[in-house]
A protein has these predicted regions:
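Amphipathic, hydrophobic secondary-structure cores in small proteins
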Residues: 12-74
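Short, charge-rich amphipathic alpha-helices with coiled-coil/heptad character
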Residues: 1-9, 36
Length: 74
């Protein structure tokens, strides 16, 4: 095993850990948004901010997952 392989493995573990953390936060935001809309919260600004954060998390997760996908030379 080469040093570069170890670094790549460490990077992959870090990326997978970050993806997991972001997915948990995304899930928590979804639950919070659902709760606010269920109780009929009139704070649309807060709901909008939560939805925006949720979209940002989804985009970040997609970027990180793309880093784990090997490049295919066509």
């Amino acid at each position: 095993m080469h040093i570069n392989d170890n670094i790549n493995n460490i990077e992959e573990i870090a990326i997978r850990s970050e993806i997991l953390r972001l997915r948990l936060e995304h899930h928590d935001l979804e639950a919070a948004i659902d709760a606010l809309t269920t109780i009929g919260s009139i704070d649309q600004l807060q709901i909008g901010r939560l939805k925006k954060r949720k979209l940002l998390l989804r985009d970040r997760i997609a970027i990180l997952e793309d880093q784990l996908t090997p490049d295919i030379i066509a």
